[in-house]
């Protein structure tokens, strides 16, 4: 079942006046191992997926939720959102985005860029989405994502905060759940004074032809080791541009993180970074 889900957002390439058509997809699955039913869990009295939808749809564009569960589909329709049912055997949100893209193309639609905003990112900012989309003004960009500076040792140590290092050209060199890089000859307590660390903000944008190729790749050993699908892309020679954002995101993977998000929501009126 497909419910009107075309999202178009035009940007101008620096050396090309042709606008790029962008599709944004919000993957949301019910059967999360750590938090079953997560998209429908209440945050500030509304389902998490509704927060994500409202953040994205506040832009003067359309968006779509891609789900494999009728309960999520019905919830989205109830609060006035737009959704599509997808297969239940996808290994990642990226694969789910790929299915949506193919469904649209089968209807004769054309898109240049697909943006993947996970359904557990209730604090996603429009500024972050624009930063990603604007990066495709560079015709060399295949994949774009975000990073934010790490401000505490707790953030640096947590395996739930994925760390990223990038080259001077903004291309990712590696992602890890461990603190990277290692600072030789220094005590851990001094690492952040000697090295700037960044955590990965898991929002992606892809050129459509690249997304199609990514969904055809087999899992890689590095991906399995770290449980990070973006390592599969790096291992297969794709470049990931990493842009820095000042805005904090709180993804929700567990009930404990939902409690943290509740506190952040209460404080959000005094903190412009949310």
Segment roles from a protein language model:
Residues 71-117, 121-131:
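Short phosphate-binding loop-to-helix
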Residues 67-68, 124, 206, 253:
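A conserved hydrophobic position in a structured secondary element of the catalytic/binding core
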Residues 60, 109-111, 139-141, 238:
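Short, high-confidence coil segments that cap the C-terminus of an alpha-helix
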Residues 192-274:
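Conserved alpha/beta core of the MobA/IspD/sugar-nucleotide pyrophosphorylase nucleotidyltransferase superfamily
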Residues 125-217:
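Conserved core of the sugar-phosphate nucleotidyltransferase
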Residues 1-19, 274:
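Short, basic, low-complexity termini and linkers enriched in Ser/Thr/Gly/Pro
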Residues 20-67:
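N-terminal glycine-rich phosphate-binding loop and ensuing alpha1 helix
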């Amino acid at each position: 079942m497909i419910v009107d889900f075309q999202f178009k957002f035009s940007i101008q390439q620096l050396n090309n006046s042709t606008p790029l058509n962008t599709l944004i997809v919000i993957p949301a699955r019910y059967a999360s191992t750590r938090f079953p039913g997560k998209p429908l869990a209440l945050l500030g009295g509304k389902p998490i997926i509704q927060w994500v939808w409202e953040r994205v749809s506040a832009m003067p564009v359309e968006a779509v939720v891609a789900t494999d569960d009728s309960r999520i589909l019905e919830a989205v329709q109830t609060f006035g959102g737009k959704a599509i049912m997808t297969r239940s055997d996808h290994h990642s949100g990226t694969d789910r985005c790929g299915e949506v893209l193919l469904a649209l193309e089968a209807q004769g639609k054309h898109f240049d860029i697909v943006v993947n905003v996970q359904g557990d990112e209730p604090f996603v900012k429009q500024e972050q989405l624009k930063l990603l989309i604007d990066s495709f003004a560079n015709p060399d960009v295949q994949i774009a994502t975000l990073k934010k500076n790490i401000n505490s040792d707790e953030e640096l140590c947590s395996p739930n905060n994925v760390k990223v290092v990038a080259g001077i050209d903004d291309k990712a060199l590696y992602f890890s759940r461990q603190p990277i890089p290692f600072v030789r000859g220094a005590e851990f307590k001094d690492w952040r004074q000697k090295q700037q660390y960044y955590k990965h903000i898991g929002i992606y944008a892809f050129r459509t032809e690249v997304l199609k190729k990514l969904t055809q790749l087999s899992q890689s050993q590095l991906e399995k080791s770290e449980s990070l699908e973006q390592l599969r892309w790096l291992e297969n020679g794709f470049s990931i541009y990493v842009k820095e954002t000042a805005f904090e995101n709180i993804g929700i993977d567990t009930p404990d993180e939902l409690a943290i998000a509740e506190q952040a929501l209460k404080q959000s009126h005094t903190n412009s970074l949310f």
